[in-house]
From Swiss-Prot:
Stretches in topological domain Lumenal: 20-502
Protein name: Pheromone-processing carboxypeptidase kex1
TM helices/strands, residue ranges: 503-523
Gene symbol of the encoding locus: kex1
Polar residues composition bias: residue spans: 535-550
Chain intervals for the UniProt region annotation (Disordered): 458-487, 532-607
Length: 607
């Protein structure tokens, strides 16, 4: 025990001090191909309590018109962001407990991707067990300290457009962190320094407004046909819902993050519908789970993540501080119990100010999630006031339309947007949208960040709003690696050679035209030497130089392309030069239609 305590006290002295110390040189089980550039390890945020946050950073595969960084957070509170890294938006998915494969919907395509186990004590992060956090503002303060030190280590990312994304209880974390960043930036403006360009927030199936979302449990259960009217189940759940609604009307209840009477609605539904030791999966009601778990064993990939992240070679590869002795767990029960947030107001109260300050916000929901269901998200939007309107009101009594979204020919969901807030509903999707719809969720991210891949190329995805094709976003190719750099050099060399060839062909055509024009001029000058009357009745034969004749011609008007007869130009066309050799581009049929863009504190600390 004494040695363990001593190692924790000494850990800041032996912690990494430069970016090179965080470099991930290899990753057990990684697929063949160019190795991704990544860094991982701990950053100290509170020396008094040995508070350290673990991060894992992936460099983007491509840069499209500007540098971007996306921070991803899972919820709980107390659930590791390695869930997001290995089951949702990271570059890899686990095939088994020792083999990785590429994720087809990876979010590091056009953005640097930063996963953080937050708050301290979560996942690979650690702190003294008697110093776990209790409030949202404490968590946000730690996170700003983390970012200060991260950007000191990696200053090349400090000016990236910054986005914060996550799901479930991260719906509380993200707005609080955004507000803390804004407060920090204001201080930087006054005292000098680099502001972090925070551009947007993305929250999936978020726990944001308990007062709006608790009543949605019964509404969702009814709408999905999980409790038929007239049955005892329906009667019992409705009675519990009435108690919840009554409790929410008591003074101060709407500013609480956890209302016990409302938690009972979900808990009793799961208990009363348990049959043959099987209950509904509260994260995907299309599925069942063993009794008492009710979704805690889901997704199926989960069984591979813990063994993989507890492997000694993986722990070493990720530069885990030896002072972290307990090993990785998905959700830390002690962190969850400590994080009561009794003195914190729900993050929904922060969203209007963030939006009005110019930050774009995107809320997205999978339609089969119960615990943070889409009805609750739609209700909180409907009741929220921001930028001079209520909900998706575009003018008094007029609401922004819902647009049908299709992806590669299949219905994907619905888009709705007004005044810097966008809502996306994903069809056939769970609490973890990117797990079910990896490529569609990446398409959503790219559009929200306004990614422009016009200069990159690649095979675009077919994404449409109300049948109208959206700008291209998807692209393939090598990652940022040695092989990628070599391929890029080769591509530039070929481009230069192609340009040189084209320029040579262009010069040849000009020379041919010049020779013919010169010969024609000589022939005409011999015939008209006796005195040709020009249009202005001037005798052109008196001109003594070729230059003066060109000057006389130029004094009229500029020569336009339309002055030439196409038939004459065709006569100059060399049969050895094909049209595609000197074509400079083709018309694009892309249109200009652009859509800009909890893991509750209840029974389970979810992903």
């Amino acid at each position: 025990m004494l040695l363990s305590a001593l190692s924790l006290l000494l850990s800041p002295l032996v912690s990494a001090s430069s970016a090179a110390d965080y470099y991930v040189r290899s990753l057990p089980g990684a697929p063949e191909g160019p190795f991704l550039k990544m860094h991982a390890g701990h950053i100290e945020v509170d020396p008094d309590t040995n508070g350290n946050l673990f991060f894992w950073h992936f460099q983007n595969r491509h840069i499209a018109n500007r540098q971007r960084t996306v921070i991803w957070l899972n919820g709980g509170p107390g659930c590791s962001s390695m869930d997001g890294a290995f089951m949702e938006v990271g570059p890899y998915r686990l095939q088994d407990d020792h083999t990785l494969k590429y994720n087809e919907g990876r979010w590091d395509e056009f953005a640097n991707l930063l996963f953080v186990d937050n708050p301290v004590g979560t996942g690979f992060s650690y702190a003294n067990t008697n110093s776990y956090l209790h409030e949202l503002d404490e968590m946000a303060a730690h996170f700003v300290i983390f970012l200060e030190k991260f950007f000191e280590l990696f200053p090349e990312y400090a000016n990236d457009d910054l986005y914060i994304a996550g799901e479930s209880y991260a719906g509380q974390h993200i707005p609080y962190i955004a507000k803390a960043i804004q407060d920090r930036n204001k201080g930087i403006t006054e005292n000098g320094g680099t502001k972090w360009p925070l551009k947007g927030l993305l929250i999936g199936n978020g726990w944001i407004s308990p007062a709006d979302q608790y009543p949605s449990y019964f509404k969702f259960i009814e709408r999905e046909g999980l409790a038929k009217p007239g049955t005892s189940l329906h009667h019992n759940i409705n009675a519990l819902n009435e108690v919840c609604l009554s409790k929410l009307e008591t003074p101060g209840a709407k500013n609480k993050l956890d209302v016990g009477a409302c938690e009972l609605v979900l808990q009793q539904f799961l208990d009363l519908t348990t049959e043959d030791h099987q209950c509904y999966n509260m994260y995907d009601v299309r599925l069942k789970d063993e009794a008492k778990s009710c979704g805690m064993n889901w997704p199926p990939d989960l069984k591979n993540i813990e063994p993989y992240l507890q492997r000694p070679d993986v722990v070493k590869a990720l530069n885990i501080n030896p002072a972290k002795k307990s090993g990785w767990t998905e959700c830390a029960g002690m962190v969850h119990m400590a994080f009561t947030a009794k003195n914190s107001i729900p993050s929904v109260h922060l969203l209007p100010g963030l939006i009005e300050s110019g930050i774009n916000v995107l809320l997205f929901s999978g339609d089969k999630d119960l615990i943070c269901n889409h009805i609750g998200t739609e209700t909180l939007i409907h009741n929220m006031d921001w930028k001079g309107g209520t909900g998706f009101e575009t003018s008094p009594g007029v609401w922004a339309p819902r647009h049908d979204w299709s992806f590669e020919g299949e219905p994907a969901g619905i888009y709705q947007s007004a005044r810097n807030l966008t809502y996306v509903l994903f069809y056939n999707s769970s609490h973890m949208v990117p797990f079910d719809n990896p490529r569609q969720s990446r398409d959503m991210l790219d559009r929200f960040m306004k990614v422009d891949i016009a200069s990159i190329g690649g095979q675009p995805s077919d994404s449409r709003i109300d049948g109208e094709k959206l700008p291209q976003t998807a692209v393939g190719g090598q990652a940022n690696s040695t092989a990628a750099e070599q391929n890029e050099k080769e591509r530039l060399k070929q481009t230069e050679m192609h340009a040189y060839t084209k320029s040579g062909e262009a010069v040849l055509i000009i020379v041919i035209i010049g020779v013919i024009a010169w010969g024609f001029f000589i022939w005409r000058s011999r015939r008209t030497r006796r005195g040709y009357k020009g249009v202005s009745n001037n005798d052109m034969s008196d001109s003594t130089s070729v230059l003066s004749r060109f000057q006389n011609k130029h004094s009229g008007r500029d020569v336009e392309a339309g002055d030439f007869d196409e038939a004459e130009l065709d006569q100059l066309h060399s049969p050895s030069i094909e049209r595609e050799d000197y074509a400079v581009g083709e018309a694009s049929d892309d249109d200009d239609h652009i859509i800009s863009h909890p893991e509750t504190g209840g029974n389970r600390q979810s992903s």
